[in-house]
């Protein structure tokens, strides 16, 4: 009799398939028709299918990256990009990064400017901190800008909480 039970299990046809290759998703109506054991089997099989698909995607992405890495044209382009990056970095270091941080535009003495540049890690800070004529002409513009900012700040303080101009 024990053999007859196992043969009945083997003979059962599941609507979702018996292995990963024959798996198909079931609709909610079909899931409701399944008993508890069949539902557990369905969930296990669904999990296996998801896992296999994920592994296949990872394998294919690894294969794609390997083929790109083996391609001589891609290697040449990558080497050229790397060389260009090295050249641009060396040029920016030679300039002392003055393109990004202009110490001459800072207000204060040379000691303060050199300290600022040292904190940023810029070499040859002494040559950069020398004030240029353009920086001196900008001082009047800076004073005017500061005056306007102070006026705007005071205007904001006075009108704080009045809810004017907000469409309310």
Swiss-Prot record:
Q: Which residues form the signal peptide?
A: none
Region called Disordered, residue ranges:
1-35, 48-97, 126-168
Q: Which residues form a coiled coil?
A: 29-95
| Keywords attached to this entry | Coiled coil
The record's induction entry says:
Differentially expressed during meiosis.
Q: Where is the composition biased (Basic and acidic residues)?
A: 68-85, 140-150
Enumerate the GO terms in the molecular function aspect.
Answer: RNA binding
Which Pfam families does the entry mention? SMAP
A GO CC term? nucleolus
Bias kind Basic residues: ranges: 157-168
Q: State where composition is biased (Polar residues).
A: 126-139
Stated name of the protein: Uncharacterized protein tam10
């Amino acid at each position: 009799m024990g053999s007859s039970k196992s043969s009945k299990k083997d003979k059962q046809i599941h609507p979702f398939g018996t292995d990963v290759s024959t798996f198909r998703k079931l609709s909610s109506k079909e899931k409701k028709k399944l008993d508890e054991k069949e539902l557990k089997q369905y969930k296990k099989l669904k999990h296996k299918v998801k896992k296999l698909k994920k592994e296949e995607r990872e394998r294919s992405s690894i294969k794609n990256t390997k083929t790109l890495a083996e391609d001589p044209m891609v290697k040449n382009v990558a080497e050229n990009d790397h060389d260009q990056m090295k050249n641009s970095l060396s040029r920016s270091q030679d300039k002392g990064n003055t393109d990004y941080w202009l110490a001459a535009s800072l207000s204060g003495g040379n000691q303060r400017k050199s300290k600022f540049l040292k904190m940023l890690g810029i070499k040859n800070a002494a040559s950069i901190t020398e004030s240029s004529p353009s920086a001196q002409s900008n001082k009047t513009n800076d004073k005017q800008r500061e005056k306007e900012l102070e006026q705007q700040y005071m205007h904001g303080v006075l009108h704080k909480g009045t809810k004017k101009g907000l469409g309310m």
